[in-house]
Amino acid sequence: MGSSSSRVLGQPRRALAQQEQGARARGSARRPDTGDDAASYGFCYCPGSHKRKRSSGACRYCDPDSHREEHEEEGDKQQPLLNTPARKKLRSTSKYIYQTLFLNGENSDIKICALGEEWRLHKIYLCQSGYFSSMFSGSWKESSMNIIELEIPDQNIDVDALQVAFGSLYRDDVLIKPSRVVAILAAACMLQLDGLIQQCGETMKETINVKTVCGYYTSVEIYGLDSVKKKCLEWLLNNLMTHQNVKLFKELGINVMKQLIGSSNLFVMQVEMDVYTTLKKWMFLQLVPSWNGSLKQLLTETDVWFSKQRKDFEGMAFLETEPGKPFVSVFRHLRLQYIISDLASARIIEQDGIVPSEWLSSVYKQQWFAMLRAEQDREVGPQEINKEDLEGNSMRCGRKLAKDGEYYWCWTGFNFGFDLLVIYTNGYIIFKRNTLNQPRSGSVSLRPRRSIAFRLRLASFDSSGKLVCSRTTGYQILILKKDQEQVVMNLDSRFLTFPLYICCNFLYISPEKGIENNRHPENPEN
């Protein structure tokens, strides 16, 4: 489906016979085919001939003998044509109904008035609408009225949307432009046109992009299209960080951003610190929507603005101020333990003064106990899949591969002595536990075996942000010896589309029961 789509909508064919009967009664005399009728109308029909000739005055009959030989020759030539199929395009019944009954309003038995316009329609067609079916079959006073004034309380509905909605009752297909789909959906929901509602949903799902996603998401929350809402969330999870956009940041509301940041399916680029940076830029644009700079300028302008706020609020954490309180519920979904595990990131988040120090203190304590367990308590990593732990507490990180080639990288941060090296080569994605073979700035664990829980996802997108291809390992437990390599995904590089995006979830150490999690209880007011 491109910018528009179509869907077959059922029509009451019984109504067709009733409406066409009147149209035929008004028609003038038909054109005759043969015999005396033909003569009276000035036409001559010659058997075997292909032409009808108009006479001047009375009918002039043809001499069959004069044409016999010619007809025999033509008959021989035309014999093959008798066995050759031919097509003749007939006028569509649906088009006839739409033009004659809807656009022209012939044989109308009811007039619908709304938004300063009127439509001459037919009750038998309107009964396809749940709204009008109830009106005409119930005890409403409108059931016996010939003129009905419709009140339109929904501001999304306009005259053009009503035109499409009413017209859908008279035709087999409806073309819906993405720019008009929200208004048409609103009209379809009001009139209870299930077929048109479904088609609007399909149009939305096929045309989600950076310009439409927020408008679609808002509208389907109102009108209850859960499948479209799910598609919008999937698009946002995939594109929020991989294809950052100033306009998108401005349009994303607090509730939807809370869902995105809290999800383990967020396609993170780089590390959790970049999730924090994305949130910081988004919050700035929510507070200063008039800013119209470029994406490259955004982070610098954001840091300057929050620096001024720190001075104005005398060192108070921004999320504790009145302007910052509405954003608390979103920032609580940050996985702070993976930010403070890197020195540079820990310094930045402390200096920004956005997150309250109490939040950070509890995470420092939690990570200190986890480090002691890894060093002194024979902790070798997760031994079984705990989906709740993985989805709520795993490290989120990612990488963009611009083109095919060989890549070697590791993500920053202290991971309890587990130095994981990621390799992409010839369509293989390999995890290697680095201990002695590669240089390492921090300490590494020399335990014979270490285990991690992980999930790897791979994706590529088209220009609209739609998923072109994707692969996932699902959640797994991987046990590696010192300097051991393990292929975790095998791809056919001939069929890969670049740039390629790789996103991983890791859990290096199991959360200890009884130790407070870094996730803060939700404030009901937020």
From Swiss-Prot:
GO terms for molecular function: cullin family protein binding. Expressed predominantly in testis. The keyword Nucleus applies. According to some authors, GMCL2 is a GMCL retrogene on chromosome 5 which is likely to be functional. Residues 108-178 form the BTB domain. It is found in: Nucleus matrix. GO terms for biological process: germ cell development; protein ubiquitination; spermatogenesis. This is Germ cell-less protein-like 2. Its main location: nucleus. SMART domains: BTB. Residues 1-85 are annotated as: Disordered. PROSITE patterns: BTB. A motif (Nuclear localization signal) lies at residues 49-55, 85-91.
